[in-house]
Amino acid sequence: MKLVWDENAWQDYLWWRTENRKILKRINVLIQDIARNGNDGIGKPEPLKHGFQGYWSRRINDEHRLIYKISDDQI
């Protein structure tokens, strides 16, 4: 699957690269799991509601979430 990043999400990802390698590793594990298992798997996948239908969230940790949408062959 091809990864497509929102500009703000990419900036957050780059920030985690320098600030907290543990969270960056968790984000990478979640992305790999999404590519393998779609909307099932680790991180307690939950569909979002209201204006975010079609989007899902997974827990990075107690405070942070990874928000994503799967379309065709893109995450």
Label each residue range with its predicted role.
Residues M1-E63, I70-I75:
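Basic, Lys/Arg-enriched alpha-helical interface segments
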